[in-house]
Amino acid sequence: MTQPIGLDGLPEKASSSGTTYLDGQLLIAMPVMQDERFARSVIYVCAHSPDGAMGIIVNRPAGSIDFPQLLRQLDIVADGVPIQLPDDGETVKILRGGPVETSRGFVLHSSDYAIEDATLPIDNGICLTATLDILKAIAQGTGPRRAVLALGYAGWAPGQLESEIQHNGWLHCPADPDIVFGRDMDDKYQRALQKIGIDLGMLSNSAGHA
């Protein structure tokens, strides 16, 4: 994230058609998931089209750095200058958004903030912005009310996500902003399952859709 960040090269949101795409849905990893990078993960799907899919893991904290430290590392805020954080929570959570392009930053945020030609509205009042301007706005107290910053993203080639769902890799359901922006990372997986009426203790490897 040492350079300005953008959405270049990511799948576009699909236009309306007879095909069902999962923009704005949560993917919930099934126990059969073999890839440890995605085990028990909850992923917010930002874009899904015939060209592939892109999403952000929302229950994996980065851990090694907090948001104020990052702002100072990027010289967005000088040492000693106060930072005005969003109303919802004491700080913006930094997530490990996925294994692709982990040096890039992506901000999922509420729809009360947008940058023309840089903010992607997704669904249910959730947007994606990937420029340093939003970090500056958050630091100055003029950014979105709710936000999380993800380093990296999860990406799928054309047809790959559909195949993984068909082979019982993922459940999916409409996103809940309280899960996406929630501060307690440990309970997001169970909360997402509860949203579709599934008890974690009884979850089988059979396929299912919400």
From Swiss-Prot:
Pfam families in the cross-refs: DUF179
Entries under HAMAP family matching the protein: UPF0301
Gene3D superfamilies, per the entry: VC0467-like
Organism: Afipia carboxidovorans (strain ATCC 49405 / DSM 1227 / KCTC 32145 / OM5)
Protein family: Belongs to the UPF0301 (AlgH) family.
A single cellular component GO annotation: cytosol
InterPro entries: AlgH-like
Protein known as: UPF0301 protein OCAR_7326/OCA5_c07920
